[in-house]
Amino acid sequence: MEYCTKEQLIAFEQKVAYHWEEGDLPYLIHLSGGNEDFLIDLFKDMRDGDWIFSTHRNHHHALLAGIPEHELLARILRGDSMFVFDSNRNFFTSSILASTCCIAAGVAYSLKESGSDNWVYCFLGDGAEEQGHFYEAVMFVEGQDLPCMFIIEDNNRSVDTTLIERNPTKFRFEMPSCVIRNDYKATYPHAGNGTKKHIIFKNKK
């Protein structure tokens, strides 16, 4: 499964950032930047029929899952940036931290019981890593040997709070094999790392 190049991913987020800075988007958006290479390699291993559970920061995931650029941009412009889904592609998101982890584990259990060889890929950020739902789901998946992978996209931010501010000891559990982590440095236009412009939102009818 591979539908976008690195250049296309970056250009798309720059386009969304432009609309944001022009005041066209009086809604919350969460842009990505700096994690393109990792995601492209990861999505190359995904197959049709696999399930993807994304987060509020989902634009890269949606494009790599095959949602067309024009369709995704239209959804973002109408305020659905955090709620993108496509049931035909088994692609779902949620704006609530770690809320999809247990759902992903349940889908993986169903796939195993039905004899399917498809997998579930569940994304979360380093802020969601601190939520109990995540650990419950990981223990269930690992204990039942389910076809589910949890991908922690660690941009060292929970809203605007760094790991050292949230966890001064930097203590982290050793994760089982069903969890992989991508530590990356956020680059523009990643939300929280942009131009810090004062934006006047345009009236929406």
What are the residue ranges of the model-derived segments?
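Cofactor-binding active-site loop characterized by glycine-rich and histidine/acidic residues
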Residues: 14-17, 24-144, 162, 168-169
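Thiamine diphosphate
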Residues: 144-205
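Active-site-facing substrate-recognition patch
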Residues: 1
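Generic recognition of cysteine residues
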Residues: 4, 101-102, 122, 148, ...
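Conserved N-terminal diphosphate/IPP-binding helix and adjacent helical/loop segment
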Residues: 5-19
